[in-house]
Every structure is written in C-alpha cells, then in structure tokens.
C-alpha cells in the first residue's frame, strides 16, 4: 500500500459502461454495495456515482441540460436534419457531420458529433455530456484512424490527452504535467489521487481492469472477475493465469452467460473457481394474467399481425409507436381487439408496460424504447419470431418461432395455466439472481 492514510475499500472497476456493465453496477448497488465505482469509459452520460478515470479530472458542470440535436453550433446556412435514430449536418447537398444520440434515441439528445472533411472522412468527433457541454474531442488522420482524444474542464482547458498511437496519457494538473505509459498507470494514479486502496477489486474484463488488479499490492487474494463475454472455443490466456493460481490477487471468476460458463467447464475450468452468476433485476410489477398484448414498433411491417389478431379475438392488442403510423397500420383499427397508439409519449408507453402481460417481438426494423428488456422487467411473457427477434437475452429459446409456425405462439398464449411457470423460466434464462447471491460474492 502506498500510503497509510488511504481509505481501504472494495472497488468495482468496469472496462466500459455498456449494457452488461450497467447491469453489473446496478446489481452491486441493489445488493447494498456502497464502495466506489470506476470505469475506463469516457461516457458523458454516466450515473453520478460512477467515475470515469478520464472525466474525473474535468470537474463537473452540474445544472445544465443535455443538448438537443438542433442546439449544435453550425455555420450560417448549414442545415441540421434528424430522425429518431440520429442526425446529419448539411452544407447545401454536402453532408458535413453526423450526430449520434444518447439512449433512448428518440429523445434526440446529442452524445457525439462526427465532422467530415471534403472527402467525407471523419476527422473530428465532438463529445457532449448530460449537462450539454463539450467535454472531449477526438482527432482522426486523413484515413479516418484514431490519433488522439482530449478532455476539457468546464472552462475549456485541456486536462487529459490520450494518444492512441503511442498509448501515452498526459494529465495537466495543478500547473504540472504528468505522463503515463498506459491506462493502467493512469487508473492507479487516480486511486492515489482519491486516497483509495482497493482491498478487493471487482472487475469485468481481462484487459485493463485485470492488469490494474495485477499491479496492486497483494493483500488477501480476494479480487473477483465477472466474465461477461460470450461462448468461445478456448480459455483466454489471462483467465488461465487465474485458473492456474498464478494471479496476484484474483481467486474467483463469475461467468454471466450460461453458454459461456458451460463451455468453460467443458474446457476443463475448475468448478470451484468458475461459477455462474447473473444479475439482480429490479422488476417493476408482477404479471396480472390479463389478456393484454403489447407490441412496440416504428415500422408497419409486423409479422403475422393480421393472423394473430383474427385468431385471438379475446386478446387485446396494444400497438404503440413513437412516430405517426402508416395507413397500412392504421387500418387495423377496424378490429375491435386492436388499440393503436401513434406518436406515443414516454408516460403512455410506461402505462402500457404496466397494463399488458404479454409482449410480442414481431416487428421488423429497429427495436424502440429497449422494449424487450422493459417487457422482461415488467414481467410480460415475451414471444417472437426468428425473423424479427431483437434481443434474445430475455426470451425463452422455445418461445421464438419461425413465422410460419405462428399457431405455436397462439397455443402458448392460450395456455394461461402455465403462465407463471413460463415467467419463472423466462427469469431463469436471463440468469436472475437475488440480493443475497451478490452479498455472498
């Protein structure tokens, strides 16, 4: 340990802040973990209690609002266009920029803007955070390859620069310049800066977080890897180090995908070290056993909708969209058991998830409002077609059918006597854990 006055505490260190990292973070918090959470991600929309190793040095400008797509600064006479999936910046007929939205996309909140040169190669990316200010800028070479990224404080001063060619990281702090050879050194410096010593490190990657663990002083050999990658035909080299007992601090591996865990055991991984562990989900409600079916779509291409509506006259179909609906879809108003919600607001969509007890993932094109996950969290029984399914993580494999076998879907919906059992199976397929499972880690 580098200093006796440091706070000794368990730490959760995440490689990025994608969906599975968020689920791990939420599982820890729900289970009562009150230690610090850090990430190598420079995401500008992190929860307030998650610290980026980069943007920590930029300070906070709280109270501002996230930037809407038409609030991007552009030269006079340039035009900004947007849909529910992204935006573009035009100079007459020339596309000069591309706008990427933060999730949920339909709110059109700006996350990143790519700026193109005259050959339509991205040369600069501007990064905006949840307070609406530009906190980072990425530079690309003329081939569109990453060169560097700078991070700024609220006054626009450059605080951190990462060179993607040399992998060096430069920190400008208190009129001094610090140079770090890699992200691992940089992360360790942040721990020192905050007077934190990780007594246990919980982490989810064999990349940077693993090397941070290996570079900390060994105390009790109690660090834990949460393995979130999918099925693969071999055991990763750094994982083998842990399995062979050669890691300085890590002694346990929790695998968060069933297929990946089964394969690791098949490959000879020690069952005492490698164990399955899913997530603690915050379920919003219980299934009420009503006859309400929900479909969320921005497309009028809904597989077998007509057949399902006709074959199940006693079921109420609620079809919602963030956009206006085409005449093709509006024509379903002729059925007494179909209710359409064009231009649906967030509050209305939430009410539908609370009202309905079945979700059909049968629409083509992109998924909206993270509908499959929301259906899962609201305990709707989820069914879909192979041709349309968006997120298999939360769906029982035997409830995903070929569209030609839609009658099998109907039989499951009609079989109300097995609804609770099927919901329990659905929760199991998503590896649902309870709070005590995480307290025992």
Explain the meaning of each model-derived region:
Residues 381-384:
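Short hydrophobic beta-strand element within catalytic cores of glycosyltransferases
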Residues 327-344:
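Nucleotide-activated donor-binding/catalytic signature segment of Leloir-type glycosyltransferases, i.e.
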């Amino acid at each position: 340990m580098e200093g006796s006055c440091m706070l000794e505490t368990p730490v959760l260190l995440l490689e990025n802040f994608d969906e599975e990292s968020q689920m791990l973070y939420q599982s820890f918090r729900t289970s009562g973990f009150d230690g610090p959470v850090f990430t190598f991600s420079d995401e500008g929309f992190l929860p307030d209690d998650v610290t980026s190793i980069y943007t920590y040095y930029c300070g906070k400008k709280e109270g501002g609002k996230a930037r809407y797509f038409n609030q991007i600064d552009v030269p006079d006479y340039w035009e900004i266009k947007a849909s529910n999936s992204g935006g573009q910046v035009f100079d007459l007929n020339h596309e000069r920029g591309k706008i990427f939205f933060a999730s949920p996309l339909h709110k059109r909140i700006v996350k990143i803007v790519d700026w193109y040169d005259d050959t339509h190669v991205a040369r600069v990316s501007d990064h905006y955070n949840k307070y609406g200010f530009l906190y980072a800028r990425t530079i690309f070479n003329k081939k569109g390859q990453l060169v560097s990224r700078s991070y700024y404080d609220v006054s626009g001063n450059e605080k951190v620069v990462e060179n993607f060619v040399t992998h060096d990281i430069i920190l400008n702090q208190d009129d001094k310049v610090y140079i770090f050879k890699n992200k691992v050194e940089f992360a360790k410096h942040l721990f020192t800066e905050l007077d934190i010593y990780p007594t246990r490190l919980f982490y989810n990657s064999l990349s940077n977080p693993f090397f941070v663990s290996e570079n900390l002083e060994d105390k009790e050999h109690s660090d834990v890897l949460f393995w979130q990658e999918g099925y693969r035909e071999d055991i990763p080299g750094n994982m083998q180090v842990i399995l062979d007992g050669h890691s300085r601090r890590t002694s346990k591996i929790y695998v968060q995908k069933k297929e990946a865990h089964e394969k690791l055991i098949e490959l000879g991984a020690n069952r005492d070290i490698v164990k399955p562990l899913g997530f603690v989900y915050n379920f919003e409600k219980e299934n009420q056993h009503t006859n309400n079916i929900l479909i969320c779509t921005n497309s009028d291409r809904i597989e077998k909708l007509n057949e399902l509506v006709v074959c199940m006259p006693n079921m109420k179909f609620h079809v919602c969209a963030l956009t206006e609906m085409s005449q093709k879809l509006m024509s379903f108003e002729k059925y007494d058991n179909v209710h359409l919600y064009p231009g649906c607001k967030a509050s209305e969509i939430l009410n539908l998830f609370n009202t309905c007890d079945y979700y059909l993932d049968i629409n083509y094109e992109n998924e909206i409002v993270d509908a499959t996950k929301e259906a899962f969290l609201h305990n709707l029984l989820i069914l879909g077609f192979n041709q349309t399914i968006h997120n298999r993580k939360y769906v029982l494999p035997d409830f995903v059918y070929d569209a030609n076998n839609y009658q099998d879907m109907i039989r499951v919906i009609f079989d109300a006597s097995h609804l609770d059992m099927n919901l329990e199976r659905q929760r199991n397929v998503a590896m649902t854990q309870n709070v005590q499972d995480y307290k025992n880690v």
